[in-house]
Every structure is written in structure tokens, then in C-alpha cells.
Amino acid sequence: MNQDIDTKIESKIHEDLSPTRNLTGLHLKIVAAIAIIWSLFQLWYASPFPFWFNIGMFKGLPARAIHLGFALLLAFLIFPFSKSKKISIVDILISIIGTFCCLYIYFFYDQLVDRGGILLKINISENFILPIELIIGICGILILLEATRRVIGKPLVIIAVCFLLFSYFGQYAPEMISHGGLSLKRLVGFQWFDQEAIFGIPIGVSVDFIFLFVLFGALLETAGGGKYFLDLAFAMVGK
């Protein structure tokens, strides 16, 4: 009896201290479905099938954008804004917007390349021009920072914000590290629509290698492979 009570107390403490939501029911099924689709995409991208069938081939930047889109979608569904464990409409909305900002790169990649870094503007009327890609880039950067805060914590967000401010206000930095400063358009264009910033080498390595290692490691652990190798090691040393 006391053991059952202790187990329930430990479970409650873990639930309260865990940064993630305890998903159940429909929410759990949705998150699981997204994770499965993400895994299938990564397996397809890493396989030779796209080249064999000449279909579903992804270039570097679009593949990285899709990868980050899945990550943002799951981040806001799994990690809550506060101690509340329920998924709010705001979390769902932010996750959809963040995913859209990433998928925009995939759907309009050729146009982005043709414009050579010039962000698209839409003429709404004679007196109003909507900087659509500037807005998408700003939203994507802000949502990524919020996702980073939820998953990892504030320190990395603070470092990223400091470098963004340094890029924009570089002319006010000490002379040894000062530079001309980037305009908001150039900053957003480089950070969000280029393959050298947010979608640079780290995400490239994640797309090509890290995700697959984590996926197959999780499958191996679930299938009992971890216990098998431990038992094998103990058997080899005679314990």
C-alpha cells in the first residue's frame, strides 16, 4: 500500500517538474502522427528511392526547412508556454504559423533563388506595399526563438538575440569588432532565406545524420537492443 502511494507521489512530482506535456487521447495521436510523418520524410530523404524513381527529390535548403517545420510543429504541441499542461489555441496557432514560415521556403524556393536575396513585396494598393517575405522571416525567427526557449531554456535564446542585435547595430559596437550594420531586410533575408544562417551546417547535419541516428537508436532501444547489448557485455566479462 505504502509502495503504491510512493509511486503515485513520484509520478505526480515528475509530472509537475517535467517541461513537457503529458499528452493523452487525441492530442497524443496527433503528435504521434506528426512524428511518424517526420520520420518517414527523413527516411525517404536519406534513401536512394528518390533517385531511383526520379520523384520526391529535395534540395538542401528546402529539406532543411521541412525538417525545421516539423520540429517547430512538435515543439509547441509538446512543450507548454507555462506550467499549464493543456494545449492552448495560441500554441496551435503559433505552431502552424512557424511551420508555414518554414514550408514557404520549400514551395517558393525557385523564386527565392531567382530573386537573388531580394525579398518579395506585394502591392496592395497605390499607397500600401506589403513586405510579405520580410514579415514571414521575422515571424519565423521569433517563433524559432520561442521554441528554443521552451525546449532548451533562456541562455541560448539570449546568446542568439545578442548576435542578432550585433548584426543590426554593428556600427555602434567597439571599434575592434564594429561593422556597417545590416538593414532589417538584409538581416532577415540572410537569417531566414539563406543556407548559411539558421538553415546552415547544424541543421544540415541534423537532417543528414543526427535525426537518423536518434531514430534508429530509439527503435533499437524499444526493440530491446539496449538490454541485449548490456547482457552481452556482462556475459563477456563473466558477470
Language model features with spans:
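Conserved, well-structured core domains of diverse proteins
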Residues: 1-128, 133-138
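Hydrophobic membrane-targeting signal helices
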Residues: 40-45, 107-108, 144, 165-169, ...
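Perimembrane helix-loop junctions in membrane proteins
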Residues: 46-49, 53, 109-112, 116, ...
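C-terminal ends of transmembrane helices
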Residues: 75-85, 144-149, 222-227
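Membrane-interface loop-to-helix entry segments
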Residues: 89-97, 128, 142-170
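Membrane-embedded alpha-helical segments and adjacent helix-loop junctions characteristic
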Residues: 141, 158, 169-239
